């Protein structure tokens, strides 16, 4: 069994697990934990210095779970402190602020940091990840929509929740699902449960939706060079349409991506003789 897994327990027995939080500074990691554990919201921002540690007990089905929570500082300055806490982890709360695109874009870097610190023998497949799209109460400042965040999470087999530490929305549901998944992981010999969402669309579909969403124009969206012929434009459009048609693709954002492809084709063909 992998090093990050606790010893397998019989049903009904207590279980001890380690959970860490990851994400940029000021995305609300500490506030999410406080909202769940202490049922309160701290409006004044207090930066986490290095690591905050806490213990809580929860019950999942007929088991008592002792949860050791390591709330890790998101500022790069504290890398030398937090890099000691990645190992022997069963669950990760990965947080970004829906009003800060850079905090969403940084999620891949956080995963890379964890993978680096776990080393060649570490296995991130034996860890439950939950992605929290936090601060959804700040609707006016939102710049990362739900479909974009959900696509990123589900394409990696991660859980995904929309949360607000301020109002409490999504917090309890997130933690309950998170802990149940960790218990299932432990009882399944360290194998991450396969979610329906992670198996419902392909990496090719997810990559295509992300590329379309981030494209800089119609040529870029279809993946053809400026000045391409009508046949080349139609061929590129057909390929993407088959891949992303809403009747066949259930990936978050597929319907909008499909419409964008059709509109891009129409716009380009107007200017091609």
Curated annotation (Swiss-Prot):
Assembly and interaction partners: Interacts directly with MAPK1 (wild-type and kinase-deficient forms). Interacts directly (in GTP-bound form) with MAP2K1 (wild-type and kinase-deficient forms).
Protein name as catalogued: DnaJ homolog subfamily C member 27
Gene symbol of the encoding locus: DNAJC27
The species this protein was found in: Pongo abelii
Cellular component per GO, a single term: late endosome
GO biological process: phagosome-lysosome fusion
Keyword Kinase (UniProt): no
Positions that bind GTP: 23-30, 71-75, 134-137
Domain J: 217-273
Transmembrane segments: none
Functional note: GTPase which can activate the MEK/ERK pathway and induce cell transformation when overexpressed. May act as a nuclear scaffold for MAPK1, probably by association with MAPK1 nuclear export signal leading to enhanced ERK1/ERK2 signaling.
Signal peptide bounds: none
Short name of one Pfam family: Ras
Subcellular locations according to the entry: Nucleus
Spans annotated as Required for interaction with MAPK1: 1-18
Keywords: GTP-binding, Nucleotide-binding, Nucleus
Alphabetized InterPro entries for the sequence: DnaJ_domain (IPR001623), J_dom_sf (IPR036869), P-loop_NTPase (IPR027417), Small_GTP-bd (IPR005225), Small_GTPase (IPR001806)
A GO MF label: GTPase activity
């Amino acid at each position: 069994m992998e090093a990050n897994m606790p010893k397998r327990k019989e049903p009904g027995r207590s279980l001890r697990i380690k959970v860490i939080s990851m994400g940029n500074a000021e995305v609300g990691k500490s506030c999410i934990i406080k909202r769940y554990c202490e049922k309160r919201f701290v409006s004044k921002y207090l930066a986490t210095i290095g690591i905050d540690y806490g213990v809580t007990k929860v019950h999942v089905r007929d088991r008592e779970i002792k949860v050791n929570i390591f709330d890790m500082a998101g500022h790069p300055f504290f890398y030398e402190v937090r890099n000691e806490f990645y190992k022997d982890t069963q669950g990760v709360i990965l947080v970004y602020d829906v009003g800060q695109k850079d905090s969403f874009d940084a999620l891949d870097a956080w995963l890379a940091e964890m993978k680096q610190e776990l080393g060649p023998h570490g296995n991130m497949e034996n860890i439950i990840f939950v992605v929290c799209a936090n601060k959804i109460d700040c609707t006016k400042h939102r710049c990362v929509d739900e479909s974009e965040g959900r696509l990123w999470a589900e394409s990696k087999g991660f859980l995904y929740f929309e949360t607000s530490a301020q109002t409490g929305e999504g917090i309890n549901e997130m933690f309950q699902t998170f802990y149940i998944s960790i218990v299932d992981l432990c009882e399944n010999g360290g194998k991450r449960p396969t979610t329906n969402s992670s198996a419902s669309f392909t990496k090719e579909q997810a990559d295509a939706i992300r590329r379309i969403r981030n494209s800089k124009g119609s040529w870029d969206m279809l993946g053809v060079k400026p000045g391409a012929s009508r046949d080349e434009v139609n061929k590129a459009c057909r390929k993407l349409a088959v891949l992303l048609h809403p009747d066949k693709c259930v990936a978050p954002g597929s319907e909008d991506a499909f419409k964008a492809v059709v509109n891009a084709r129409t716009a380009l063909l107007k200017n091609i003789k």
